[in-house]
Amino acid sequence: MKKMFMAVLFALASVNAMAADCAKGKIEFSKYNEDDTFTVKVDGKEYWTSRWNLQPLLQSAQLTGMTVTIKSSTCESGSGFAEVQFNND
């Protein structure tokens, strides 16, 4: 059981390690999409997410002018993301 737990923990750490910092800045705009995804524009690039738990947090960050860092394994504009870092600067 312990070996299986460690293997899962290592796999999760490996996946998170692959997520690069794609864009850092204030959210320029956000919108809901017809396919139930949510798009934000940061640092001149648009990224979408299907994680509903991130949407109210991203909207709050936009309204308060908080800086965010979008993290993804693909950093091309128009790509998806599942991780965001909220910064206090």
Swiss-Prot record:
Disulfide bonds join C22-C75. It is found in: Secreted. One of its GO terms (biological process) is symbiont-mediated hemolysis of host erythrocyte. Residues 1-19 form the signal peptide. Its main location: secreted. Keywords: Disulfide bond, Modulation of host virulence by virus, Secreted, Signal, Toxin, Viral exotoxin, Virulence. Pfam families: SLT_beta. One of its GO terms (molecular function) is toxin activity. One of its GO terms (cellular component) is extracellular region. Belongs to the stxB family. There are three Gb3-binding sites in each subunit B monomer, allowing for a tighter binding to the target cell. Binding sites 1 and 2 have higher binding affinities than site 3. The B subunit is responsible for the binding of the holotoxin to specific receptors on the target cell surface, such as globotriaosylceramide (Gb3) in human intestinal microvilli. Shiga-like toxin contains a single subunit A and five copies of subunit B. This is Shiga-like toxin 2 subunit B. It comes from Escherichia phage 933W. The gene is stxB2.
